[in-house]
UniProtKB/Swiss-Prot annotation:
One of its GO terms (cellular component) is cytoplasm. One of its GO terms (biological process) is tRNA thio-modification. This is tRNA-cytidine(32) 2-sulfurtransferase. The thiolation reaction likely consists of two steps: a first activation step by ATP to form an adenylated intermediate of the target base of tRNA, and a second nucleophilic substitution step of the sulfur (S) atom supplied by the hydrosulfide attached to the Fe-S cluster. A motif (PP-loop motif) lies at residues 48-53. Pathway: tRNA modification. GO terms for molecular function: 4 iron, 4 sulfur cluster binding; ATP binding; magnesium ion binding; sulfurtransferase activity; tRNA binding. The lineage of its organism: Bacteria, Pseudomonadati, Pseudomonadota, Gammaproteobacteria, Pasteurellales. The gene is ttcA. It comes from Mannheimia succiniciproducens (strain KCTC 0769BP / MBEL55E). It catalyses: cytidine(32) in tRNA + S-sulfanyl-L-cysteinyl-[cysteine desulfurase] + AH2 + ATP = 2-thiocytidine(32) in tRNA + L-cysteinyl-[cysteine desulfurase] + A + AMP + diphosphate + H(+). Homodimer.
Amino acid sequence: MTELETKENKKQIYNFNKLQKRLRRNVGNAIADFNMIEDGDKVMVCLSGGKDSYTLLDILLNLRHNAPVHFDIVAVNLDQKQPGFPEHILPEYLSSIGVEYKIVEENTYGIVKEKIPEGKTTCSLCSRLRRGILYRTATELGATKIALGHHRDDMLETLFLNMFYGGKLKSMPPKLVSDDGKQIVIRPLAYCKEKDIEKYAVAKQFPIIPCNLCGSQPNLQRQVIKEMLQTWDRRYPGRIETMFSAIQNITPSHLCDPNLFDFKNIKRGQLPKGVEGDIAFDKEELPQTPIIDEDTEDFVNNGQLIRFKEVN
């Protein structure tokens, strides 16, 4: 190996380590900010075979070695009996990394196909069926937390989906309790960018399994929102970061929901807690979010160069 090749190899290793540290830091911060994992927890990581859930499992396993609390991990995959689903991939992968796992076999694919007319969106029914099965499995395994692989971009997409199509100011919470009060669901990737997860999944060479059930629905409303946000991100760098910051800084007195703020009892001469005066827009110019050029990064995996360059 020449001196130039050695230098390039070191740079690529450095870039991968930087990416991994960034993901670990973001996951660690989310866990701490929302008290997602506590001492003695058994965390059930829902593994679909996609880039997000693989990354979630990998980072949690990595963090567990240095975490200030002890927690166990069990990976769970729901085999929905989709035609052509490669049943061997996840058991082989999970066995190779030595993690406890369970494969749950339920023919939700057949139910969805039976109930949903051809050409209609299957996501709503599919997600409800999956949720019920995963909650039941968590109880059977004695899991105290259910970890899902939704990331920052998913949360913003959900925000706009609810605004545009549902008339609600609502996103995905980083932590929630199930309707029956028996399960706690956490999203440790809440602070992670999808671009970082994509790069990490390729660099780690996870055996990705595509979802053929919903992948054949190109006109999904979520896909429309995703493309809109991606366009904004390319044209206006920093906008996504600013929007995510917005859902962490809510001012109920400047919205229109009387359930969140007592507008009826506002009196002259009073400045109740939570009121920020008569300024609707805080500044003429939004504060600039520092933008780090993370779009071009080269990694080495098993001696092979993996190059990432985002195309605008």
